[in-house]
Design a protein with these regions (language model features):
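Active-site anion-handling motifs in enzyme catalytic cores
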Residues: 1-380
């Protein structure tokens, strides 16, 4: 490749093993390669996230081409970083940590001056006292050398307001070029209150619909099975209660995790307790393939919901966290539960009766992708 080739970059790519994050990266790569066909695309992994090498190799085998770069610098050996990892949540000063990092490390980011545009990976970003500091500090460092920083649709937890004042967040998110696209109504409402100009879009994974339709259903599976894909390392009893209720309703249940590094130990324990099969797909494509052969997907993972939607199968969301709660509201889902322990035979019968309505609501939600941003350039 010639040294003077035009380049764009993706930063904060999450390669830790969540197939939803790999789907985000694939959607971004396909969108950007279509918009910038003559450009080299460099991908920088998230500075403080691990890399699932096996699933990353599978992603490289199946996905579009790109140049993988080394992680950008970040200092995780500071007193702040240690304090931020403690459950006691000592009083923290994240802004001071951000600018301390910028002062010490900004020269290392001069290489970003070579890019025509830089794109922040979509998804749930700026989370907590550690990751938010890492991301904001990185953006400030890059901004010194290149102000053309855009972001694919992302969401932010309301808890960020416990770390930063509103005017501070306005300044920090002001590092992003407009349009700032958020992927749900909850984040949009929070940004409106803070005076941060944004537009509501959809997770960029919705842009993979045509590709998803070409994926063959998984062989050797029974169509009447219910796929239970509920995450929660700290609520084992509730997870088991949900599985038991589905089994007691006379249905066949199989477990599936979209993020094996996080859920693997729990899903194996549940599998052993109930003597049921479990699956840990290596790719988002394999996940869609599994979802195409079932009667219902029960999940609290946002990308479980989105990939289930791409598979055009029925969904029962478990809205025990903000992301599925936002999905339920935005997609106007007729049935959901607040916790897996609230699943019961009566609810499942209602879901059966409303399968057509559920699938139609999901189709309507997907169709919004043609009218809303799934990237920072969709409507330009």
């Amino acid at each position: 490749m010639a040294s003077d080739a035009k380049k764009i970059a993706i930063i904060f790519a999450n390669l830790k093993g969540n197939v939803g994050d790999f789907a985000i990266l694939e959607a971004m790569l396909r969108d950007l390669s279509g918009r910038f066909p003559s450009h080299v695309i460099d991908v920088y992994p998230h500075p403080v996230a691990s890399v699932d090498k096996i699933r990353f190799e599978e992603f490289q085998r199946l996905g579009p081409s790109f140049d993988l770069k080394r992680k950008t610098a970040f200092d995780t050996k500071t007193a702040y970083w240690q304090k931020a990892g403690r459950k006691s949540r000592e009083k923290l000063n994240p802004s001071r940590e951000i600018f301390s990092f910028v002062e010490r490390f900004s020269p290392y980011f001069s290489k970003f001056s070579q890019y025509e545009k830089i794109f922040v990976a979509g998804g749930e970003q700026f989370v907590g006292p550690r990751l938010s500091v890492c991301m904001f500090a990185t953006l400030f460092c890059i901004h010194e050398f290149n102000k053309n920083i855009y972001a694919y649709p992302f969401s932010v937890r309301p808890g960020i307001l416990n770390l930063y004042q509103g005017d501070v967040l306005s300044e920090y998110f002001g590092l992003l070029r407009k349009p700032i696209v958020v992927r749900d109504g909850i984040t949009k409402g929070m940004f409106d209150k803070l005076g941060i100009e944004s537009v509501v879009g959809l997770d960029c994974v919705h842009g993979l619909m045509n590709l998803a339709r070409s994926i063959a259903p998984q062989q050797g599976r029974r169509q009447n099975r219910v796929i239970y894909s509920v995450s929660g390392q700290n609520n084992f009893a509730e997870l088991c209660a949900g599985v038991e209720q589905v089994i007691n309703s006379g249905r066949e249940v199989e477990l599936l995790t979209t993020c094996y590094p996080e859920d693997g130990s729990v899903i194996r324990k549940i599998s052993e307790r109930f003597a049921i099969n479990w699956h840990a797909p290596m790719s988002w494509q394999e996940t869609v393939s599994e979802f195409k052969v079932c009667s219902l997907v029960i999940t609290n993972r946002l990308h479980g919901l989105i990939l289930g939607s791409l598979a055009e199968t029925a969904l029962l969301p478990v809205a025990d966290r903000k992301k599925p709660e936002a999905f339920v509201a935005d997609a106007e889902m007729p049935h959901y539960v607040k916790s897996p322990e609230f699943i019961n035979s009566e609810l499942l019968q209602k879901v059966d009766a409303d399968i057509i309505l559920i699938i139609q609501r999901m189709a309507d939600y997907r169709n919004k992708a043609a009218l809303l941003h799934t990237g920072p350039f969709t409507l330009e």
